[in-house]
Curated annotation (Swiss-Prot):
Top-rank taxon, per record: Bacteria
Catalytic activity: D-mannonate = 2-dehydro-3-deoxy-D-gluconate + H2O
UniProt gene name: uxuA
PANTHER family: MANNONATE DEHYDRATASE
Reported function: Catalyzes the dehydration of D-mannonate.
Cross-referenced HAMAP family: UxuA
Protein name stated in the entry: Mannonate dehydratase
Lineage: Bacteria, Pseudomonadati, Spirochaetota, Spirochaetia, Brachyspirales
One BP term from GO: D-glucuronate catabolic process
Keywords attached to this entry: Iron, Lyase, Manganese
């Protein structure tokens, strides 16, 4: 297995590369140019610099999360071709630097949605949580402001300030965009970029929608096994696949995560593994990675990855805020380090049992 940690860069992350290097078994990072403007092509110099910084710390960049996709592309505006061309230029820069994985999503407006960034767990830790009743009663603008004010001063991925100023405009732009239209626009995007991906062997790994159902009336198209299989089969390329995020798909208890993993053999390029606790229909709290702390069977999930021969990068996903750490919600050092070691322990046990 290749264990990694997500790292947002020295100017945006409370966790340092030195600290990541000291987590047992962690070989590298999944990172991004966090200050890049969505829609612009990345500069070769910037990619070289962050690659050198990571390698100087004794680590490796195993992938990018994310090269965000402008809403013009998702909506299918006439301007999309210009921004797809910029995206292709970015892929070329990454490919020339030997970076061969991009995790991305195709969620409208919000990359992910939570009702609380600091829900208190029985052990006193705090976690991200979702309550559909709260979401149903809150205005999107108000929710955005609330999330931003509770971010501990960090810019959250997918919640960039420039989106806040355009929120009402974006909702207007998505009127008339249903699941089918959004899927058509995803297929258009993938068809356009696949030749470049194949040239440089860049695996495009779409991230499931989070949570795995419609929010604020916006379409959601990557929420279950059927959606994912349709997506990977719609654009036939060895570079078109999935980031298997156990937590995002697991937000809907109807999704059988081990079954989904086995159904996608050969199409999973990257894995996010985390636990959550279902508290009621449409309500969940994130939890420690340990199976008994939540509703998900982490052993069964890791066993499914082992059974399909998965050799790509893993990362522990959102961690609890523990031991008085102040960090970007979900992305502190301590609980993710615990998660990384726990997942590797499961993998070692499964591997030895299989011999």
């Amino acid at each position: 297995m290749i264990m990694t940690l997500r790292w947002f860069g020295k100017n945006f992350d409370s966790v340092t590369l030195k600290q990541i290097r000291q987590i047992p078994g962690v070989k590298g990072v999944i990172t991004t140019l966090y200050d890049s403007k969505v829609g612009d092509a990345w500069k070769e110099e910037d990619v070289k610099n962050i690659k050198k910084e990571v390698e100087d710390a004794g680590l490796k960049i195993y992938g990018i999360e994310s090269v965000n996709i402008l809403d013009d592309i998702k909506i299918g505006l006439p301007s999309r071709d210009k921004y797809i061309e910029n995206y292709i230029k970015t892929l070329e820069v990454l490919g020339k630097e030997g970076i061969n994985l991009v995790c991305y999503n195709f969620m409208p407006v919000f990359d992910w949605t939570r009702s609380d960034l600091a829900k208190v767990r029985p052990d006193g830790s705090t976690v991200l949580s979702y309550d559909q009743d709260i979401i149903d009663k809150i205005d999107p603008q108000k929710m955005f402001e609330q999330i931003d004010s509770n971010s501990n001063g960090f810019v959250l991925p997918g919640w960039e300030p420039e989106r806040l100023s355009r929120l009402k405009e974006l909702f207007e732009m998505y009127k008339g965009i249903d699941d089918e239209k959004l899927f058509e626009n995803l297929k258009y995007f993938l068809t356009a970029i696949m030749p470049t991906c194949e040239k440089y062997n860049i695996k495009m790994a779409i991230h499931p929608d989070d949570p795995a159902w419609p929010v604020f009336g916006l379409p959601r198209i990557i929420v279950n096994k059927e959606n994912i299989l349709r997506m990977v089969n719609s654009v036939n390329s060895p570079c078109n696949g999935i980031t298997l995020c156990a937590g995002s798909l697991g937000s809907n208890p109807k999704n059988d995560i081990p079954d989904i993993i086995r159904s996608l053999k050969g199409k999973i390029f990257f894995a996010h593994v985390r636990n959550l606790e279902h508290t009621a229909p449409g309500k969940f709290q994130e939890a420690a990675h340990l199976s008994s702390d939540g509703s998900m069977d982490m052993f069964a999930i890791m066993k499914a990855f082992y059974d399909i021969g998965f050799e790509g990068p893993f990362r522990p996903d959102h961690g609890r805020a523990i031991w008085d750490e102040v960090s970007m919600p979900g992305y502190g050092l301590y609980d993710r380090a615990l998660g990384a070691v726990y997942l590797q322990g499961l993998w070692e046990a499964i591997e030895k049992m299989g011999k």
